[in-house]
């Protein structure tokens, strides 16, 4: 019996340790599972949390003590969790760190959290949607707490006075909530605090004097509250302070001189208060300062000369005060300045020349020579709303890092320096409301990062420089109230990001470029009080433009001003290219005749009659000959005959042999009947939509005429003319220009500019001796130019459908121009069978979706054709080549070579190795990406342009490549 009792005791004592370990482990698992049940986990970040697990130590976001296996840390930052913080956490008795920041948690914070979890040292619940108030006893047992962040929530009420119990607290962040009332005095007894952030709340009352107790404080942020009264001088006792932000309160009085004791302070922000007095000279003793912001206060007097002692200063903001006098020359000593803002004061004197000089001499030299200075690192310079005079120094171009230049509302004179074009990072230039004169320098286009250009209310004259087209990021262009002359440059339409344009109150003349209607982001457009005339562009912002935006231009017409435009008919064909056509009386007026009638003598009339008789005879004989030959000989040329006089100018006649010819330029048209023939001897080539002939107009000016062979499919005359006129408005440096068109019911012609360089196909595959003269740089520029053109077409909602090397033409200087664009718009419906039959000559270029009726045809079919073209240009091979017993598809061949690491072997051997291999291989990879079988996997053409620019200029500078 006794032995059995001893055995039982030993057994219980042996099992007891095991039983003592099991329940706590189960408590941790149970607590976390209960906590998870209150959450929504859209990204399945808590999928590893399994209630059947013996221990949670391997769960995502959970960390345990290595010896006891108890949960000590729970870190679920940024898990996209939503729901509430449930009671399950209270089971984690050994938890040291709880971090749930950057989620979408809502509800209240459990008032017993800190009471139950007495081992907590770090609590971070910031950046959630927690609400409610904290009860007074919330902090009653927080002696172990070292870090507490409840920032960026929706907490309200007063900060509990029990905060004083957190005797070990080193960092307290309650910012960006709705806490109100005064700051509890208990905070100022936490002498372990290193960081205190109560900013962006609704705290009120005076700044406590007991701040001197926080002698370990390094960072203090009480900004954006309602604090009032003076800044206590006791703040100088916190000698370890490095950052102080008391901005956006209602603090008053002068700066306490104890600030100068804060030798470690590198950031002092007191902006947007009611502080007054002079900026003290002792400010120069705070030599560690990198940021000094006293803006939007009531400071007066001059900027102290001691400011030059702050050699580490990076940001100096004294804006919005009542400072007077000139800018001290010692400021030039602050060679590390990145931002200088003195706007909104009453500073006077000439604009210091040292501001715009990249000098290196010290202040002693500056006192004798104001032409040098040292703030060459400056990024933002704002001296606006002062009374500075003088000129902007030419040394402005030395400030290569400048991003914002604000000199508006001063009394500056002289020209805008041409060196403005050297500021490649400049995004804002505002020199408005001054007395600047001269012209807008054409070098302005060199500031390629410009987003905002404000030059209004000056005395500027001359033209708006077309080089402004290079500022492709420009959003705001304000040039009003100047003396600008000339016309509005059509290049403005290339600034596709423009949102605001104001050219009012100038001397501009001419018509408005129609392309401005394509600016999709434009919401403000003002051209009032100029000398502009003609019809307003149709579409875009111009459909809802306010009449006041165009007032003061008597010649403007259109629906906006409720004034119809005079119907000026197309000019008829005349033999004298120097003559003009009077649209009001239908007469041809020779040069120098003005509006006078020409009186013909009798001998002249006889001569004209005789000539007319001869012409009639010749025509009669010609007609007879043609009738005889018509049955046996096919025509070798198609004569173009036109209705004469007023009939031509209005509409085609009912005679099928008469037609309507319109030249968009308005210039006189065909010079002789012979040149108006589509002679087969002058045929340049044939495609799916018709043949192309070369002919001459306007005293030997060559053009290319495409005779459409889809007459049975072409739309009606009205639809045809409407679509062709849209195509005629397209303008791009890499687009073949459409000069005009000709229409009859049986014959339709499109008249293009003639390009002497021939097609890319001939340059690649039909060069004499098989030796193409295209260098690698030529080929890269052709690829880039083609890409930019297609991007422009897609931006204009036009799909090419037929991109291939024979449709890429070269001008005399080798620049590529894309032709045959928009022809599919002339078909009555974009039927894929019709399209595929018309572009069947583009074998190898056709995107695979043409063969699948369930896939929508988009601009990605052009991307596919472009990709094939890229590979063709780089390799010099045709898209499809037929061998004796095989067919080689270029895309497949190159893709296989790339996978085998032999991409460089595909490059055209005619280049003889004279090309950068890495660049060529990168271009090949782009071509293969563009030829993806899945349309959505192909890039947009705009993306392709950017990729090409990055390939050529990896550093990010694409100046040498131009802009689209």
Swiss-Prot record:
Main location: membrane
Pfam families per record: LRR_1, LRR_14, LRR_8, LRRNT_2, PK_Tyr_Ser-Thr
Protein keywords: ATP-binding, Cell membrane, Glycoprotein, Kinase, Leucine-rich repeat, Membrane, Nucleotide-binding, Receptor, Repeat, Signal, Transferase, Transmembrane, Transmembrane helix
Disruption phenotype: No visible phenotype under normal growth conditions.
Distribution of this protein across tissues and organs: Highly expressed in root tips, shoot apices and developing flowers.
Start-end of each LRR repeat: 92-116, 117-141, 143-166, 168-190, 191-214, 215-238, 240-261, 263-286, 287-310, 312-334, 335-358, 375-399, 400-423, 425-447, 448-471, 472-495, 496-519, 521-544
CDD domains per record: STKc_IRAK
Catalytic reaction annotation: L-seryl-[protein] + ATP = O-phospho-L-seryl-[protein] + ADP + H(+); L-threonyl-[protein] + ATP = O-phospho-L-threonyl-[protein] + ADP + H(+)
Signal peptide (from-to): 1-20
Presence of the UniProt keyword Membrane in the record: yes
Gene3D superfamilies (alphabetical): Phosphorylase Kinase, domain 1 (3.30.200.20), Ribonuclease Inhibitor (3.80.10.10), Transferase(Phosphotransferase) domain 1 (1.10.510.10)
Glycosylation site list: 104, 173, 317, 370, 470, 526, 562, 578
Membrane-spanning segments: 604-624
Ranges facing Extracellular side: 21-603
UniProt-recorded Gene Ontology molecular function terms: ATP binding; protein serine kinase activity; protein serine/threonine kinase activity
SUPFAM superfamilies cross-referenced by the UniProt entry: L domain-like, Protein kinase-like (PK-like)
Record's bilayer topology term: Single-pass type I membrane protein
Enzyme Commission number: 2.7.11.1
InterPro entries linked to this entry: At_inactive_RLKs, Kinase-like_dom_sf, Leu-rich_rpt, Leu-rich_rpt_typical-subtyp, LRR_dom_sf, LRR_N_plant-typ, LRR_R13L4/SHOC2-like, Prot_kinase_dom
Changes after translation: Autophosphorylated.
Amino-acid positions noted as binding ATP in the UniProt annotation, renumbered to this chain: 684-692, 706
Subunit structure: Interacts with IRKI.
Record-stated family: Belongs to the protein kinase superfamily. Ser/Thr protein kinase family.
Protein name: Probable LRR receptor-like serine/threonine-protein kinase IRK
Organism: Arabidopsis thaliana
Chain's gene name: IRK
